[in-house]
Design a protein with these regions (language model features):
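An N-terminal assembly and electron-transfer interface module characteristic of large anaerobic redox
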Residues: 1-259
Length: 259
């Protein structure tokens, strides 16, 4: 993008999709899906979240990730919606800027969608204006503190499309995200009683073992309750969790024999 501009970025994206089309995949046994949402630095930085995506993938999940562009766009969109909904008086230039910014995001997403549709597994995502309005039963879509309505909006949208496992990442002591993260869990569970919603607090002293214990509870609950209505391993197959535990047990037995 820096060297070749927008046209170069689009060409690079097309090449990436072409290379992905050459990768073989097997969808005969769909994995249960889990949505990861929360504070955006934790959400998108593997070092900060202890590579939670890789861990859940190793344990048999298909990851649904939130979109970084929605985090950037949220402020422009919410300001524009607040002006329209509450009839706020703002300078004309500022009103126009919010409107233009939203149009630019729409154009960029449309261009990316046209290219990404060349991959057979690509599903166009819900655009921000429709996504955030999913949260209205819980939090008005004009709310803009912390991650705003992105967390409830994402969860409700994917819950309506069959996902039943959700992980909310939040820094310990981040009050706005505790309101729109942990604070919405009770209402979410009332709306979707079979949903597994796990808020995870991160701080500098938290160990991965602590996080792993809570993640394993989510993994086992998904396996036992068969959430997400997909074919989980039957009695004749070992689940990824069982396989991992069996490998660890064999390794421990070998160590004991050597000693």
């Amino acid at each position: 993008l820096e060297q070749h501009g927008l046209s170069g970025a689009l060409r690079g994206f097309k090449k990436a999709i072409q290379r992905m089309n050459a990768i073989e995949y097997d969808r005969s046994q769909p994995r249960p899906r889990v949505l990861i949402v929360g504070e955006y630095l934790l959400n998108f930085h593997p070092g900060a979240n202890h590579e939670i995506e890789r861990y859940l993938e190793k344990n048999g999940f298909e990851i649904i990730e939130a979109r970084m562009t929605d985090v950037i766009r949220k402020t422009y969109f919410c300001q524009d919606e607040q002006i329209r909904t509450y009839h706020l008086k703002k300078p004309f230039v500022k009103k126009k800027w919010y409107h233009v910014a939203n149009r630019v995001f729409d154009a960029a997403h449309a261009a990316a969608d046209r290219i990404a549709k060349q991959h057979p597994l690509y599903t166009p995502v819900c655009r921000l204006p429709e996504l955030v309005k999913e949260s209205d039963p819980i939090i008005p879509h004009t709310f803009d503190a912390g991650e705003g309505v992105l967390i409830p909006g994402e969860i409700l949208h994917h819950a309506e499309h069959g996902c039943r496992a959700f992980v909310i990442l939040q820094p310990f002591g981040c009050l706005p995200n505790h309101v729109v993260g942990r604070g919405i869990v009770k209402k979410m569970r009332e709306m979707y009683p079979d949903a597994q919603i796990l808020p995870l607090d991160y701080d500098p002293d938290v160990s991965f073992a602590n996080l792993e214990n809570r993640l394993q509870m989510l993994i086992m609950n998904v396996k036992e309750r068969c959430v997400d209505t997909v074919a989980l391993p039957d009695a004749g197959q070992r689940s990824p969790v069982e396989t991992m535990n069996r490998k660890q047990k064999n390794a421990d037995n070998k160590k004991q024999k050597v000693s």
